[in-house]
Amino acid sequence: MTTVTESAVKALLTSETTASLRTRYEGSNICTWIGFKHINYLVEEAILYHFDQSGLAARTLHAEHGLGVDLVDLDTRILTALFMDEVVVAKVVPSAADGDDSISFTVTLHADRDGKDTKAITAKAKAVLRSDNYAEEAGEPPTPIARFVTHRLGTPAPRLPEAPDLSGIVPAADNTSLAAGRGTTGPDPVLDLLTAGKNAFGWKWRIPYPYCHFSERLQMSSYLRQMEEVVDLFLADRGISVKTLLDERRWIPACPHSRIQILDEALMEEELYTIYTVENIFKDFTYTSRMDCYVVRDGKLVQTATGKVTHGYALIENRRDWNLVTFDERVSKALRGEV
């Protein structure tokens, strides 16, 4: 068994790491630009590389010590677009003050722009080590890294409203059948409760195993997928689907900022209730929305994640160039729920 040494943990917490990473082909959905989800994937990949270079690779930690590396907070800003087949340089700076029970990371992605080193992406993240007793008992964690070990995922909750009481409400059980594919947006009594009186959209979906890791739980990258998916469904519900505005105007959603925090665990094959609420529209140029995710457990709503994402719209000028545009009345009304 690999020993978790003091020197390896010191490297994990104090050494900076630099890695060359390549954008993923899958992340290029419109022309050759890379979407926000795959930009976040690069940030995650850089952090995992840092673990590996410190001598504490994620596979080793799990296979030998029953510890799963989990990102529980990921806050990313896109300063300039990344492209298909682009190699970026990731710089990872870790930190952990005395008494911290998570490891913090600052990650920057640098790209070449006309021969100049350009900071394209900045991100802040937190990671913990989740003790895993699924296949066998994990045992006591190695002492040098024990303070970062948790028996359940979660971050200190931001100031969120308390989850509604489900008293008298029986969750629908027949609207996320396998034939339904993407689940349901209603009618559903729990979705109705969570969206009532808000400029919000609700989606209920059965968590499939490809969205999980370490055999049981939803992971950060899958919440990013969830965020991307609920935006797609929301826009279609408001009559301004991605394809509609592409075909009519060559407009595409453009995302400069996203953040997701995991508050509790969501498990494989649970029903996940995702609520997408438009909170602010800034000068008809960008809008910021909140994503809240819940499961129903023992008859109560349990919030498992919260996040925020900002979008604008970009006009595709040609296969290489785009420019941000102001919302017109149709789009503005759709986002405000005035359709």
Mark where each language-model region is:
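Hot-dog-fold acyl-thioester-processing enzymes
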Residues: 2-71, 126-256, 314-339
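HotDog/MaoC-like acyl-thioester-processing domains
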Residues: 78-89, 93-179, 267-268, 278-339
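Hydrophobic beta-strand-centered segment that forms part of the acyl-chain substrate-binding groove
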Residues: 51-104, 237-281, 285, 306
